[in-house]
């Protein structure tokens, strides 16, 4: 005949509770000892009765098992902290992915893509955004044009000023210096200084010959009476 299954609930009688506690405590400690022997496990049991009486069992040293438990609990807490950090990073990553997807969608809509699901208000807002963006582009373009024009005007003024300075320097050169400058220019155009001096000497000789010829012609032109 099968034993009737007893309902697990608090025993109301204090005496019956104490008897049941004593019997089941011995059975619990026996099972713990068997588990430690069969499985080579460190087992520790600490039990307080309803009256506050302490009962304990340890397969080895209770203090050693408790120290091992505390060490394991501390290490477990440290190991769980990176897991929490990893969950936080994963949450941030998911949030950034959502923001990236929204920004990509807005960019495609700015290009005129994927507009089918937008309402009239959303389309009007998109139109305003496009107009504002176009206005900023035009302002930036005009600003760059003005900067380029100002730079060209500055360079033109600088060249004009340098040209004026050169003109002033040339106007201050004396005629003799101008002749030297012209001679130097003549030399640089392909003739040596010796050829220049030869040309100048031949010119002076021709001038002297012309003067002598003039004297002869004048002497020949005198009347015969003047010779006496």
UniProtKB/Swiss-Prot annotation:
Q: What tissues has this protein been observed in?
A: Expressed in palea and stamen primordia. Expressed in shoots and coleoptiles.
| Pfam families, per database record | K-box, SRF-TF
Which stretches make up the K-box domain? 86-176
Domain MADS-box: where? Answer: 1-61
Instruction: List locations, semicolon-separated.
Output: Nucleus
A biological process (GO) of this protein is: positive regulation of transcription by RNA polymerase II
* One GO cellular component term: nucleus
Gene3D superfamilies per UniProt:
Transcription factor, MADS-box
UniProt main location, coarse: nucleus
Tell me which UniProt keywords the record has, alphabetically: Developmental protein, Differentiation, DNA-binding, Flowering, Nucleus, Transcription, Transcription regulation
SUPFAM superfamilies tied to this protein: SRF-like
Q: Name one GO molecular function term.
A: protein dimerization activity
InterPro entries listed in its UniProt record: MADS-box/MEF2_TF (IPR050142), MEF2-like_N (IPR033896), TF_Kbox (IPR002487), TF_MADSbox (IPR002100), TF_MADSbox_sf (IPR036879)
Explain what the UniProt record notes about the effect of disrupting the gene for this protein.
No visible phenotype under normal growth conditions.
Region entry Disordered, spans? 189-217
Q: Which purpose does this protein serve, as stated in its record? A: Probable transcription factor. May be required for spikelet (rice flower) development. Transcription factor that functions to support the MADS55 in its function as negative regulator of brassinosteroid signaling.
**Name by which UniProt lists this protein:** MADS-box transcription factor 22
- Organism of origin is Oryza sativa subsp. japonica
Q: What is the lineage of its organism?
A: Eukaryota, Viridiplantae, Streptophyta, Embryophyta, Tracheophyta
What gene is it encoded by? MADS22
